Amino acid sequence: MFAVVEAGGKQYKVKESYVIKVELMDVSVGEKVKLDSLATFGGKKKDAVLQRQSSAVTAEVVARCRNDKIIVFKKRRRKNYRRKIGHRQELVVLRVLKVG
């Protein structure tokens, strides 16, 4: 059985024991997090939707980390204008404990 959850404005397809990286949340390592499930799938028919908007997914915070650096480079030709800016998004690594 798997579920579709939303965290940080993005949707993730998860099963039990999956590890996912989501946008920064205000949680500490080892804390349990409850994510609202958009839809839960499974059962005898692979495409059957079991529950909509009524189940939840429980996950544990494994680590906090940062994503790879993204470089933003701005340039105006013939004006000697160049700007190089980097950004690293902070992430939270979650391990799914229970679906449904």
Curated annotation (Swiss-Prot):
Any Pfam family: Ribosomal_L21p
Keywords: Ribonucleoprotein, Ribosomal protein, RNA-binding, rRNA-binding
GO terms of biological process kind: translation
Single annotated GO MF: structural constituent of ribosome
InterPro entries, A to Z: bL21-like, bL21-like_sf, Ribosomal_bL21
This protein's GO CC annotations: cytoplasm; ribonucleoprotein complex; ribosome
Quaternary structure annotation from Swiss-Prot or TrEMBL: Part of the 50S ribosomal subunit. Contacts protein L20.
Family to which the UniProt record says this protein belongs: Belongs to the bacterial ribosomal protein bL21 family.
Function recorded in the entry: This protein binds to 23S rRNA in the presence of protein L20.
Protein name, as recorded: Large ribosomal subunit protein bL21
